[in-house]
Amino acid sequence: MSWQEKINAALDARRAADALRRRYPVAQGAGRWLVADDRQYLNFSSNDYLGLSHHPQIIRAWKQGAEQFGVGSGGSGHVSGYSVAHQALEEELAEWLGYSRALLFISGFAANQAVIAAMMAKEDRIVADRLSHASLLEAASLSPSQLRRFVHNDVTHLARLLASPCPGQQLVVTEGVFSMDGDSAPLGEIQQVTQQHNGWLMVDDAHGTGVIGEQGRGSCWLQKVKPELLVVTFGKGFGVSGAAVLCSSTVADYLLQFARHLIYSTSMPPAQAQALRASLAVIRSDEGDARREKLAALITRFRAGVQDLPFTLADSCSAIQPLIVGDNSRALQLAEKLRQQGCWVTAIRPPTVPAGTARLRLTLTAAHEMQDIDRLLEVLHGNG
């Protein structure tokens, strides 16, 4: 089989399964409205949970940062790309979340890959929730360590896997809020079992940070858990992009030596770090509390109105509200019908989610209004 035949076969298989991914160029993709092909849609696919991507204070901070520092960092943080803006953001994040150190990364994917690649050796074991994000599971699969997956949120199964003899160290990996189901991990129980077996806990709280807990401190703070490794991302609750790893001083020093994604990548622009500092200030403020309260009310309204639809509603109190349809083609058809009626909704299919669980992944944000939720419910009921 030639290279072209190999590529064609893979694409043909995706098409046959109604699983071919496509991108749509949009004129506006974050916030309440999505604009594509000169048409405006209510946007129920954005991860901009607090509606901060267009916040004037954050936009102003980015502009001022660009005027002060330029539009790029100029290099890796190990060479010339670590500015006083990066340093200030790291210190503010560490203080906010109660850690000694924070290290910035260009994306959550890079942060997860970097930590696992740097920390894990052949004699070690990774025990991951089987529904963990692709960045975590891919990094674990590529590492020299043994990878074992426990049944989603099943602490008993986790304990059984941890009890199996391991010559090295054990790292338990999970998410705070799961990206495709919107449910939360029982972090207190997971941490207890992990500590009983002398392991470390790594939590990716991409979808909880900024959105839940006191001052938006996220899933771990809400559940009174402090994992050894906490990954937070800035493309969801913060409304920007990038990520950080929160850890001890010695782990931070270790990652600065051995995390190749950090060492060999150009760091985020200092202007972006300034925007993130402004976003953090909003998240921690009374305004941040008000946005979280509004989002919670929108979620309650949606869940109350969707109960009698012929879909499986995930057990989620988060901004992620999936409606599990099952069949790939049915999910695609529903998403298209909703778009035709002015609601931009994305169909998520395998391999992103398990086979037979294709879904409409609906996301609600503080930028929405109650009438937007009512319109979504009206359209869903008309197509259920």
UniProtKB/Swiss-Prot annotation:
HAMAP family: BioF_aminotrans_2 (MF_01693). GO terms for molecular function: 8-amino-7-oxononanoate synthase activity; pyridoxal phosphate binding. Pathway: Cofactor biosynthesis; biotin biosynthesis. Belongs to the class-II pyridoxal-phosphate-dependent aminotransferase family. BioF subfamily. It comes from the Bacteria. Coiled coil: none annotated. Transmembrane segments: none annotated. Its cofactor is pyridoxal 5'-phosphate. Its EC number is 2.3.1.47. It catalyses: 6-carboxyhexanoyl-[ACP] + L-alanine + H(+) = (8S)-8-amino-7-oxononanoate + holo-[ACP] + CO2. Homodimer. It comes from Shigella dysenteriae serotype 1 (strain Sd197). Catalyzes the decarboxylative condensation of pimeloyl-[acyl-carrier protein] and L-alanine to produce 8-amino-7-oxononanoate (AON), [acyl-carrier protein], and carbon dioxide. It is an enzyme of class 2 (transferase). Pyridoxal 5'-phosphate binds at residues 108-109, 179, 207, 233. It holds the Pfam family Aminotran_1_2. The keyword Transferase applies. The modification N6-(pyridoxal phosphate)lysine is found at residue 236. Keywords: Biotin biosynthesis, Pyridoxal phosphate, Transferase. The lineage of its organism: Bacteria, Pseudomonadati, Pseudomonadota, Gammaproteobacteria, Enterobacterales. InterPro entries: Aminotrans_II_pyridoxalP_BS, Aminotransferase_I/II_large, AON_synthase_class-II, AONS_Archaea/Proteobacteria, AONS_Proteobacteria, PyrdxlP-dep_Trfase, PyrdxlP-dep_Trfase_major, PyrdxlP-dep_Trfase_small. Substrate binds at residues 21, 133, 352. One of its GO terms (biological process) is biotin biosynthetic process. This is 8-amino-7-oxononanoate synthase.
